[in-house]
Each structure stands twice: as structure tokens, then as C-alpha cells.
Amino acid sequence: MADPSASLNLVEACWRDLVLGVVQGLTEFLPISSTAHLKVVPELLGWGDPGVSVTAAIQLGSIAAVIAYFRTDLSQVLRGVSRAFRYGQWREPEARLGFAMVVGTLPILVIGLGIKFAWSQGYEQSPLRSIPSIAIVSIVMALLLALAEQVGARSKQLDVVLGRDGLLVGLAQALALLPGVSRSGSTLTAALFDGWQRADAARFSFLLGIPGITIAGLVELKDALAASPGNGPLPLLVGIGSAAVVSWLAIDWLLKFLQRNSTWLFVAYRLVFGLLLLVWWGVYGSH
């Protein structure tokens, strides 16, 4: 699918990618689906679907933000894993967290690369990326998050994470390849079902997303740049930069919010978002 920015001049392309970066930054780490909003917002603004490559490449800004925000945590994880390999200290919390991150990345890595190299064209044009599909998925995920909020024990903390926790949350992360699911939403929901405290669940979700989103962004970066040869890399850099700044703010806000509040705000938002999309599609999209 051709990138609509190919028909935009440099200023228009920079403005479009700036907006996409802001949308990406606001929605990547909140459990409301960045993919859905990056599909819907450009459609509403008349830009058309920017495509998988552009949206994946702009996610690199979010990854830069999460790496910078959690630089101390990541440094501790790397040191813990290093000690585990040298001295066999795999019971240390940092080593177990690193192992859980690796195990949790495998599902989305395998499935994501499979889609990229075996079903790329079909995925771009799949009904799964349609507005009604995104709306229905958003509503279903809202109901699952509501159930997790109700039944979750909210006792598990990040320092007791095990490989099985990483695999469970990692499988949920792989579901986010379906537009509308929300990587943050699916991982947060799975972690709540597994008995995690809200803020620790969000923290692990952010850390777990680093490898998978980084790989996806780098894989798609070449295609994203090739999609708009006339404007060069500047628009994409603007999008990545705005995504980084807004992502940092969103991470900081969400962690503080979940220390004091439940996820019901996001449940309500996703229900309303999904219902409004169905109404909009029924009025305008089905004709």
C-alpha cells in the first residue's frame, strides 16, 4: 500500500507526521491502542491510512522514550543478567526480570516476523484493519480489562517476576498485532488477571515492549522511508521526535495514575471509542 504522504509536500508531510507522532505518544503506553488511533485519526483528518510501515517506524520515538525513562531499571537488568551468566545467580530479581523480558518477547517476535515476511500485503489490506473490526476489538478488550480489574488479586510485584509471567504477558502482547487490541492494554489485562499490582503491571508492560517494538520499527523503517522518496527522512524524523516527547509524558502520567487509581477510566474510554467508531462507520463508512 502506498503511503499517502507521497502526494504531500514537505511541510504537509511534516505536519502529518508530527500529528501522528503525538497520537502515537499519547496512545502507545495508555491501554487504548495506538494502532487503532493511528488508523482512525488520519482517516478522520482526510489523510488516509498511513500504513503499517510508517506507524511502526514512528514507534521508535516511543521506544527512545521508554529506554530513557527506565534507563536505571534497564541498567540493573543488564547487570543482573551479566552476574547470572558469570556466577549462576539466576534467582536475583534483576536476572529473573531480564529472563522474563526475553521469554515474553518471543511470541510477538515470531508472529510479527511471520506476518512481515509471509503475509505483509494481505495484512495491509486485511479486514482486520477495517474500522468496524477495530471498533469491535476495542469493545471486547474493554470488557476484558473490566473483568481483570474486578477479579485480579493485585498483590504481585515486579521483584517476584518469573519466566512463566513473562510468557503469559508476552502471549498477550502478541495479540496486539491485531489492530484495536492495544499492546499496553492486552499486557496490562493479562498481568491483572495474573494478580499483579497495577503500577507494576504497567512497568513490566513498558519494559517488555522494548525489544519487540524496536525490532518492528527497525524492520519497517526502510519501507517507511521508501514510501515518501520526494520528502526524504525529515517528516519521519519529526514524527519520531514528537512521539518520543509525548511518550515520555504519557509514561510518567500513567505510572503515577495507576498508583492511586484503577483502570476504569480506560475501560470507559475504550467502550465509548468503539461504539462511536461503529456509529461513524454506519453513517459514513458503509456507503
Swiss-Prot record:
CC terms in the record's Gene Ontology section: plasma membrane
Single Gene Ontology BP annotation: response to antibiotic
Enzymatic reactions: di-trans,octa-cis-undecaprenyl diphosphate + H2O = di-trans,octa-cis-undecaprenyl phosphate + phosphate + H(+)
Family statement drawn from the similarity comment of this UniProt entry: Belongs to the UppP family.
Extra information: Bacitracin is thought to be involved in the inhibition of peptidoglycan synthesis by sequestering undecaprenyl diphosphate, thereby reducing the pool of lipid carrier available.
Superkingdom of the source species: Bacteria
Keyword Secreted attributed: no
PANTHER family (UniProt xref): UNDECAPRENYL-DIPHOSPHATASE
Native species: Synechococcus sp. (strain CC9605)
Protein name per its UniProtKB record: Undecaprenyl-diphosphatase
Transmembrane segments: 50-70, 97-117, 131-151, 160-180, 206-226, 234-254, 264-284
MF GO annotations: undecaprenyl-diphosphatase activity
Chain's role: Catalyzes the dephosphorylation of undecaprenyl diphosphate (UPP). Confers resistance to bacitracin.
NCBIfam families given in the database record: PRK00281.2-5 (NF001394), undec_PP_bacA (TIGR00753)
The entry's keywords: Antibiotic resistance, Cell inner membrane, Cell membrane, Cell shape, Cell wall biogenesis/degradation, Hydrolase, Membrane, Peptidoglycan synthesis, Transmembrane, Transmembrane helix
Top enzyme class: hydrolase
